[in-house]
Amino acid sequence: MNILISNDDGYHAQGIQTLAETLRDAGHSVTVIAPDRNRSAASSCLTLMEPIRVHQLDEFNYAVIAGTPADCVHLALNGFFEQSFDLVISGINHGANLGDDVVYSGTVAAALEGRHLPYPSLAISLVGRKSEGHLFGNNHFDTAAKVVLDLLPKVQKGIVPARQILNINVPDLPYEQVKGVMITRLGHRSPAAEIVKREDPRGATIYWLGANGVPVDASEGTDFYALAHNYVSVTPIQADMTAHYSIQALKDTF
């Protein structure tokens, strides 16, 4: 397959480098176009009010200067390259994209930019483990890359409809310790913690965003549940954000 890879951690990140190398070793044609720096949580932001510059690192690797993940894939699929691509893979992200994370995720946004291609895009993330409440890892990027290789033949069967993508989260474990794959729905987190107010060395007030919310819907069938039990979660998602279940109630009201 002719595969385009991007991410939100930057072209230098271990995750994207491991993924590209693994896919090339498996015989796929791989082109990497990614931000030149970490753009985590950029969501689907596009650069519209200023020009975009791209630095060619070598024949198959490109860095978008100050670009977002969505910029990268948008450029790649709309005239930057003469070639066409079969599939977009975004990742391997350094950390989870579970539940409500997908709203903010640059990893997921990059995959969504590829929704018009013949095969559903993949957003893949490596989920670090916790010890005494603290996250550590990510170490097993090779595991996540192998999971991608396992999934590609299934993706090529055309089971997933056009315009959908697969959001994939992989436990940070040796490949042999991963129990399998669960097809899941998105779970839900609580609201984020309160912002943190501080004072900089010059006396000006500054703010940090609070910590991410904790899972409040991690029941069986969710992506949170799969990861908690050492399974890979595969969740089909789409750009269509219509709340279809509310349409009739609104029609009846208006």
Swiss-Prot record:
Query: How is the cofactor bound, as the UniProt entry phrases it?
Result: Binds 1 divalent metal cation per subunit.
Instruction: Please give the GO cellular component terms listed in this UniProt entry.
Output: cytoplasm
| Gene3D superfamilies reported in the protein's UniProt record | Survival protein SurE-like phosphatase/nucleotidase (3.40.1210.10)
Subcellular location as annotated: Cytoplasm
Its keywords, alphabetically, are: Cytoplasm, Hydrolase, Metal-binding, Nucleotide-binding
Known SUPFAM superfamilies for this protein?
SurE-like
Cofactors that this protein relies on: a divalent metal cation
State where a divalent metal cation binds.
D8, D9, S40, N93
Q: Does the keyword Cytoplasm apply?
A: yes
Task: Give the Enzyme Commission number.
Answer: 3.1.3.5
GO MF terms listed in the record are: 3'-nucleotidase activity; 5'-nucleotidase activity; exopolyphosphatase activity; metal ion binding; nucleotide binding
Keyword set includes Transit peptide: no
Pfam entry (one): SurE
State the source organism's domain of life: Bacteria
Q: Which InterPro entries match?
A: SurE, SurE-like_Pase/nucleotidase, SurE-like_sf
Report the catalytic activity.
Answer: a ribonucleoside 5'-phosphate + H2O = a ribonucleoside + phosphate
Described by its record, this protein's role is as follows: Nucleotidase that shows phosphatase activity on nucleoside 5'-monophosphates.
Q: Give the protein family.
A: Belongs to the SurE nucleotidase family.
| PANTHER family in alphabetical order | 5'-NUCLEOTIDASE SURE, 5'_3'-NUCLEOTIDASE SURE
Name of this protein: 5'-nucleotidase SurE
What is the originating organism of this protein?
Actinobacillus pleuropneumoniae serotype 5b (strain L20)
